[in-house]
């Protein structure tokens, strides 16, 4: 443990040097938020079915982190899982940490992430980024409040709504059983739902009517719902019976108002919507409908108006029954609240996504006929620091050596399933999506496209994105349907080594040695 103390010192020293100082309006003084998390296994029954979950501070979902723009976060992770772990703040750049490319935190060790949220706001989440731990419960909401929120005067309260598919089997067992999406046993809203215990395996401990999540509304008040899809595999349609919604945020970025009835939300995506409590005082169903081929009942919660009697089972009245034409959010109509002139592209890549058996008969993901092969003995960053060459094909590594390059990436999906993909360390403009195996460049929106960190590649279709290479590092791009990380649907983008090898060498050398202890 003596060596670990030295290792920890260098993390704190380095982060204090490089974290930027934010500039804020309205006289807000940034502060340091000390977050203390213990990751451990606890036996719980969120839907009435008892099983062991991996939890944050014994809670499922984990505690919400709420800070303000400009604040510093010191997030200490104590690992008591009995296995290694790592934590990722999804959607956050996390400048001042090892970001995504870190070695794991061994069992019975602790690690402190130290970063400043200088220029990001909005709805995010944190989750384990080791094997399938977040499927077992290691996740929670991370909210960055904005002192200059342009919509602040238009809602009275905020409510966090976390959606997820849910398995009664430990995720590590699931991983051994499949490398394709699995039908979940249930779905939860804020960690709650009922389950039909007649479907539980013999010998299981299960209680019917475990109870639904309950959200308190006051007549005529307006609510900002921060909606997060923390699923392993499942996309949803989110709605509240009799209440329409106005979208104002997507993945931490403000949008122009978009009035809808149902919100399609894919894995790892986040939205904020404003809902007005303008219906008669009563109880209403909040619902999250599984998309596509998953034949499970709607996930439900209760919206309870102040003054209404308690009702554990409000009457079902979905938009599909009450309207002949209801409006689902079309992501193509999303526009940033403030227009942004985007630069012209200077480099272009096209990636064809396939899934087929490799030479050993195992189904793998291939990007341009190459499948990512991790080098356990020589991690990516260690290769960079030691000036080793890359086998770019087997590593699925793409190297950018110029600061400020404007990169277009086209993803062509030959699979009959959609893929929500995420880029670490970057946000990107979504220029367009479509069907077929060829990008229609005439249809690309280069005038005022939405910016995101998680977007959907359509089934048998394509997506075109653009970003500026301005964040040095080794970053992963991967499908956020978690089983595809083990096929693996993953590749690495490497940005201008000369800007970070000398600064990071000692820091990551300690991480590498610690991993080998």
Language-model segments: residues:
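Asparagine-centered strand-capping/turn motif at beta-strand->loop junctions
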Residues: 77-81, 227-231, 410-415
